[in-house]
Amino acid sequence: MKLVYPVIFTEDPAGGYMAYVPDLEINTQGEDLAEAISMARDAMGLVGIDMEDDGKPFPAPSQHVDCPTGGIVSLVDVDLVAYRRANEKRTVRRNVTLPSWLNAAANEAGLNVSAILQAALKQQLNV
């Protein structure tokens, strides 16, 4: 699922840029505009995954956003599937059935069966 929301960027008097996503009530910042955009995308990913996991609906993106003088409004997107894949490092235990001779050969060769299985699944799924 992809989310696209307007983000308000304003210069911070202390330096850098502030980013505010009004539809998700997110505030973040960056040292420059590029980093502020990246941080807004990251924050949207975190909040979006939490909402998705909790079964909460996503608000519709605002069509009109009031922007303070000197501010910039820009649409920022985040792909929640890609974000989750890139940031979720949790592993799960899964039992696999193998012929005993294949298991013995893998052990004898010192192979990491879990790593090989992960690589094969990623290749099969094109991820």
Please describe what each predicted stretch is:
Residues 8-23:
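Short aromatic-glycine-(Arg/Gly/Cys) micro-motifs in beta-strand/loop hairpins
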Residues 13-14, 28, 53:
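Short glycine/serine/threonine-biased micro-segments
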